[in-house]
């Protein structure tokens, strides 16, 4: 009898929820992203890492429909996107809560009318542990609580895909671990998929079913690591330590290449001056 498929194998063989093909993304005459194919299945978490300037946040903006000026295509649930979609919830590094609205109104306001298909704001706030502060203003919350509110806002409307851009980098270590656990619970409970951009390699290995390494100049998928470690994950698992060493080595190679490219550019500019 064959062994049961791993979580990643099951996700990989399913029809992809997200089918992304970026042929080229330009800023002026500079290519930011090139030849980036990405498929993500429901229930899968994909973490994206890479040196600064490699196009990680730009990739998220394209998937979210916030940047449509690129060559390629984005399909979510088999439907081509040409702008923002209620099926994708975006969570930024900063919570970006409207200061004059209560926490409950912030969660409900961001999504707008959705025909009653969304879960109630009260239920979402209870899910992220903020039921007791629903009527408070954002200024009264800690950074971790504000980010919990942002997660609830991202879930409003029952999106199929969560897009998180450095979501936990502005909070302390204990709060970060709690928010990571919350994200894992949310993805499992709602059967969503998630793409997480992070600079933290340990976070990527802890959260991700896959970790993609974007190379700079231009951004391409340079490496892909399948994290075949079952959840709940022990951060001390020796398998994660091996993968971390591989990621660190790949990251350092990419950083060295980026530094060398920058040095050559400066040399050329100096020669032309």
Curated annotation (Swiss-Prot):
Residue ranges constituting the ABC transporter domain according to the UniProt record: 17-241
Topology versus the membrane: Peripheral membrane protein
UniProt entry keywords in alphabetical sequence: ATP-binding, Cell inner membrane, Cell membrane, Membrane, Nucleotide-binding, Translocase, Transport
Enzyme Commission identifier(s): 7.6.2.14
CDD domains, alphabetized: ABC_NrtD_SsuB_transporters
Positions annotated to bind ATP: 50-57
GO cellular component, one term: plasma membrane
Domain of life where this protein originates: Bacteria
Record-linked PROSITE patterns: ABC_TRANSPORTER_1 (PS00211), ABC_TRANSPORTER_2 (PS50893), SSUB (PS51291)
Family: Belongs to the ABC transporter superfamily. Aliphatic sulfonates importer (TC 3.A.1.17.2) family.
Primary role: Part of the ABC transporter complex SsuABC involved in aliphatic sulfonates import. Responsible for energy coupling to the transport system.
Protein's name in the database: Aliphatic sulfonates import ATP-binding protein SsuB 2
Organism: Burkholderia lata (strain ATCC 17760 / DSM 23089 / LMG 22485 / NCIMB 9086 / R18194 / 383)
């Amino acid at each position: 009898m064959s062994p049961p498929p791993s979580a990643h194998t099951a996700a990989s063989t399913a029809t992809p929820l997200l089918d992304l093909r970026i042929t080229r993304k330009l800023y002026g005459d500079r290519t930011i992203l090139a030849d980036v194919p990405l498929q993500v299945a429901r229930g899968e978490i994909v973490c994206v890492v890479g040196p600064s300037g490699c196009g990680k946040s730009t990739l998220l903006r394209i998937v979210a429909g916030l940047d449509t000026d690129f060559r390629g295509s984005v399909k979510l649930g088999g439907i081509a996107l040409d702008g923002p979609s209620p099926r994708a919830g975006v969570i930024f590094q900063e919570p970006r809560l409207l200061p004059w609205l209560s926490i409950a109104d912030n969660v409900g306001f961001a999504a707008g009318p959705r025909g009653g298909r969304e879960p109630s704001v009260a239920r979402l706030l209870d899910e992220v542990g903020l039921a007791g502060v629903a009527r408070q203003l954002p200024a009264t919350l800690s950074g971790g609580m504000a980010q919990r509110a942002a997660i609830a806002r991202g879930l409003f409307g029952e999106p199929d895909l969560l897009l998180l851009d450095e979501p936990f980098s502005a909070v302390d270590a204990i709060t970060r671990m709690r928010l990571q656990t919350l994200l894992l619970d949310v993805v499992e409970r709602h059967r969503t998929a998630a793409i997480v951009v992070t600079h933290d390699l340990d976070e990527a290995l802890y959260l991700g079913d896959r970790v993609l390494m974007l190379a700079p100049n231009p951004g391409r998928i340079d490496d892909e690591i399948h994290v075949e470690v079952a959840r709940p994950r022990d951060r001390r698992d020796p398998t994660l330590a091996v993968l971390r060493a591989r990621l660190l080595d790949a990251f350092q190679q990419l950083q060295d290449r980026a530094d060398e490219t920058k040095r050559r550019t400066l040399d050329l500019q100096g020669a032309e001056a």
